[in-house]
Design a protein with these regions (language model features):
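Zn2+-dependent cytidine deaminase-like catalytic core
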Residues: 39-139
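Short, small/polar residue-rich loop motifs at catalytic or cofactor-binding pockets
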Residues: 31-34, 157-158
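Short, basic/aromatic recognition patches
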Residues: 11-29
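Internal gly/pro-rich beta-alpha loop/helix module
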Residues: 112-153, 163, 171-195
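Residue-level signal for inorganic ion chemistry
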Residues: 18, 36, 85, 125, ...
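Single conserved hydrophobic/aromatic residue that forms the stacking wall/gate
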Residues: 193-203
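Short beta-strand scaffold segments in enzyme catalytic cores
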Residues: 35-40, 162
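Short, compositionally biased leader-like segments
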Residues: 1-17, 122-137
Length: 203
């Protein structure tokens, strides 16, 4: 698969759904990246999944296990926000579950830059005659920015939160501290703090 692959509207739609599933896992995955996936059979979504808390199933396994009639997986397509892992850790490799399931086509939103993966998952799938297409997604790349930085640069991504009033004050005249940011910016700050890399580097 290359960047020259052509994708339909539905391909982009399903990948965006996978991105939304990945967003559900933010702040709960420890040192793992937040990943989401959608399983499709004959243009019908038959399952969805996202990375479970550390030590529990990854997104792909989570989705596959939720399909009660496993025969539906034969010939199905799976849209993964990130390249499926191919190594043993606290869980089995996701590519093994995909290969055994009978899924015949895998769409990937980004390549996992973690050196222990980085294309190995794709290679395993293609070796098993499973078609792989890389549908690069900017939102997914942004979602995994902190994770990639921790694995490639071996250091946390430094983020700073700075706020002041229009007259450059950070407290009232009687020194009482007040919120000077709105609820949206506070929620975004909490989201960044609880991201997987923040958990990984806080110990």
């Amino acid at each position: 698969s290359t960047k020259k692959d052509k994708f339909s509207f539905k391909d982009h739609f399903y990948m965006e759904l996978a991105h939304r599933m990945a967003s559900r896992a933010i702040g709960t995955t420890g040192s793992n990246p937040p990943v989401g996936c959608i399983i499709v059979k004959k243009n019908n979504i038959i399952s969805r999944g996202w990375t479970q808390p550390t030590g529990k199933p990854h997104a792909e396994i989570h989705a596959i296990r939720q399909v009660k009639d496993k025969a539906l997986l034969n010939g199905a397509e799976i849209y993964c926000s990130l390249e499926p892992c191919s190594h043993f850790g606290k869980t089995d490799p996701c590519v093994d579950s995909i290969i055994k399931s009978g899924i015949k086509k895998v769409f990937i939103g980004d390549i996992d830059k973690n050196p222990i993966v980085n294309g190995k998952g794709i290679a395993r799938l293609e070796k098993s005659k499973i078609k792989v297409k890389i549908l690069f997604n900017k939102e997914i790349k942004e979602l995994n920015k902190i994770f990639f930085n921790s694995k490639i640069e071996k250091r946390p991504l430094i983020l700073s939160k700075i706020a002041s009033t229009l007259d450059s004050k950070i407290a009232t005249s009687n020194s009482e501290s007040k919120w000077i940011t709105n609820s949206l910016s506070r929620s975004h700050g909490c989201l960044l703090y609880t991201s997987d890399a923040a958990d990984d580097w806080s110990s």
